[in-house]
């Protein structure tokens, strides 16, 4: 698979930083792409293709990273009275936008991001979104174990509440429990209930 030099260099640098080689280079390119103009166009295997923005991959990556982190929380057997506070703290300290931005910049992932023409500065939001998208792309490309290795490599599983975390492959039951816990913890904007005449 042949990329234009702009994406090829970024993909190679990203793979080196996260210590993971993608089977699908185009998936990694999408994770790194914030552009919607001509800067998102590349030549792929002789054909002109527009690489999608990374926002959807970022949503997926956020959920995947939270599910794996939740598995470490559950396997850690933290005391029940403090468990909810512990989970909130882990999410805030490890996979919040602020920490993802810090991790992304410290590892140099901000230099891999493809931006719109005329954009000269990589914002904090771009870095956090790109890292979420990278994690999502890794999970899609290599599965849950690949995601676990990349998160550990980037320090996204290092926390005093977890102690010294070793590599934990996710079994299916723990994965399902974690997805449920993550979904329950998310806060969605609630619409007011419609008032129907004759009903309370």
Where are the predicted features?
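Double-stranded RNA-binding/processing signature
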Residues: 1-200
